[in-house]
Amino acid sequence: MAKRSSLYIRIVEGKNLPAKDITGSSDPYCIVKVDNEPIIRTATVWKTLCPFWGEEYQVHLPPTFHAVAFYVMDEDALSRDDVIGKVCLTRDTIASHPKGFSGWAHLTEVDPDEEVQGEIHLRLEVWPGARACRLRCSVLEARDLAPKDRNGTSDPFVRVRYKGRTRETSIVKKSCYPRWNETFEFELQEGAMEALCVEAWDWDLVSRNDFLGKVVIDVQRLRVVQQEEGWFRLQPDQSKSRRHDEGNLGSLQLEVRLRDETVLPSSYYQPLVHLLCHEVKLGMQGPGQLIPLIEETTSTECRQDVATNLLKLFLGQGLAKDFLDLLFQLELSRTSETNTLFRSNSLASKSVESFLKVAGMQYLHGVLGPIINKVFEEKKYVELDPSKVEVKDVGCSGLHRPQTEAEVLEQSAQTLRAHLGALLSALSRSVRACPAVVRATFRQLFRRVRERFPGAQHENVPFIAVTSFLCLRFFSPAIMSPKLFHLRERHADARTSRTLLLLAKAVQNVGNMDTPASRAKEAWMEPLQPTVHQGVAQLKDFITKLVDIEEKDELDLQRTLSLQAPPVKEGPLFIHRTKGKGPLMSSSFKKLYFSLTTEALSFAKTPSSKKSALIKLANIRAAEKVEEKSFGGSHVMQVIYTDDAGRPQTAYLQCKCVNELNQWLSALRKVSINNTGLLGSYHPGVFRGDKWSCCHQKEKTGQGCDKTRSRVTLQEWNDPLDHDLEAQLIYRHLLGVEAMLWERHRELSGGAEAGTVPTSPGKVPEDSLARLLRVLQDLREAHSSSPAGSPPSEPNCLLELQT
């Protein structure tokens, strides 16, 4: 059994932000931190006070996280980025909204005394003395303290206060992972209600000391338990009066949804998985109850999630093609008009969307990547709508004469024709590159539609059915929003965005088979008609070849593609292998090309290099971040592994930004999560000279000073399938609509009482719906008998509520 938490985060837009630049504008971006750990950075939107981001993320976390904070920053090229403001949502706040937090939130000023992080290790004892009881507080160590100095560290000490008496530990220089092992004693009086306050501070020689956080201990509770030892989370000082600046710093529109799940062992989900798979295998030949019922009881707002979960479950069982084929038949059975076929947000449409993103994303990158990159690099002004042509955006064609509107339109048409032609040519050449399971699925779709709508008058309908998914729901959205499909790291500027939009419209016209209705919508697209008309013929030829795949060819192609073992992640990184001697500087990193597969992390000078080194995946013990001070630069991670002789080794890799850092960490953690010998602790610093830079320990192979974060990952399109989690999510959905399922069961069984599943299947054959209700009942009992699924609270009962 495993407890898992996932955060869905959508950063929509900001408004009324203050101007930070001398131009009266700002260059805003967002940093998202979970418990003060940066995990996401949005793109920068230049020169605006009302930025639109529209970025979505799914973050997997341990259920013990406390808060997520959104920092709006202003990017500066020459100086440090300015902090505009922040929005902080605690775990309890998010959990109090079952459907998620959604709306505008005012930005507040960032108070240094509230920017605390880390934990402190304390041992607390009450023991009898000669005249009165004594309170003994041992301050052992701390970890992950906030760096307050410019060198990326702090000089921490601890101040312990009780009943007017104050004691302080020694100062540990340049460490966010200090060790003190100092003990203080105080006299306890009967009935005394005062709390014990333990504060961490950063010592400064010239300026005032910086607050690092505090813990308030309930002494009365400590009297009862007599002794307590553990890690206590540092809290901000909330006794200070806050400035009322809400609204002055602008607002941020967010969507945040928390999902907590208790995932049972695989054996508990087997009856549910077998039942659903049996229904799909029977297809339209069986009773056909469950899949239509699931669609019928699924609301519009959760249909995409349900479709994705079902698709991933059947993909893991090798039944994705059969599942989608069943949905195609169900949709066709209730469709009489060809112009509405697969145009609604049905379970079939949503499932195919998810299917293409899971199974076809690498194919999409291969076809669209070069064209999208060229559009971004050229940055040409492109416009076909005469009412939107602006001369100031055009520039000059010669030394003196600006271009006329007609010249702009003609040049724009030429540019778009070139891009569209290149895209269609790339698509025509990509038949063999398309995954076999995608080709086989489209083959089934093509055949089903042709069977449902035979005749010459419906000749184009099977082609339009395929393009409604391939072009309208996959290629066109990727062209319009390349960042959301991981084709680019940043959003397009206004000029490039307009070019992409026009190109996407042209692709849609080709996908619609150049129908008169699509032509009539925007007459100014007429200059592209020759290319669109030619593209229709190319696209029909491509689809004819795409769906021309037999079972044997499908298996052969699948085997060929699987032997290639596509990388989980790849790209250039900088590597440093420390020998522990001399200063470690960022300049000592060497640029190499890395490729992570399900077998190894390999690296070479170039992607095509024949000679490469590798780290076996089974030898990886942890993948974690490195303190900024260690190399004088940020975005460094470490891969801790063992060599063939079993000796521990560490490779330090530098990324170019926080997003790339977290993407690589996520990928490494996901593929190594089931390794034996994973570390529970590590050193976030480096071993320099004779000690660790983080905690100053002198034992190189000793226990780490910080806990590993193997469960903190970002969800990506190429994540490994998690069958148990998908089954749990499907169970959770079915549990939510159980009343509707019982209602349908009563209708089918002639008014039987709700909650009474037939118990004698030998006398009356138990239908699939009755079996499903029985499975849900068994899973509910399994969850009830397991430990509580709610996230654990703080391990210490001595923390006093701070207001």
From Swiss-Prot:
The keyword Cell inner membrane does not apply. Its cofactor is Ca(2+). The record marks R343 as: Arginine finger. Residues 1-105, 116-232 form the C2 domain. Gene3D superfamilies: C2 domain (2.60.40.150), GTPase Activation - p120gap, domain 1 (1.10.506.10), Pleckstrin-homology domain (PH domain)/Phosphotyrosine-binding domain (PTB) (2.30.29.30). GO terms for molecular function: GTPase activator activity; phospholipid binding; zinc ion binding. Ca(2+) 2 binds at D21, D74, D76, D82. Ca(2+) 6 binds at D204, S207, D210. Ca(2+) 1 binds at D21, D27, D74, D76. Zn(2+) binds at H683, C694, C695, C705. It is found in: Cytoplasm, Cytosol; Cell membrane. The keyword Ion transport does not apply. Binds 3 Ca(2+) ions per C2 domain. Ca(2+) 3 binds at D76, S79, D82. Residues 566-673 form the PH domain. Residues 781-803 are annotated as: Disordered. Ca(2+) 5 binds at D149, D202, D204, D210. Ca(2+) 4 binds at D149, D155, D202, D204. It comes from the Eukaryota. Ca(2+)-dependent Ras GTPase-activating protein, that may play a role in the Ras-MAPK pathway. This is Ras GTPase-activating protein 4B. It comes from Homo sapiens. The gene is RASA4B.
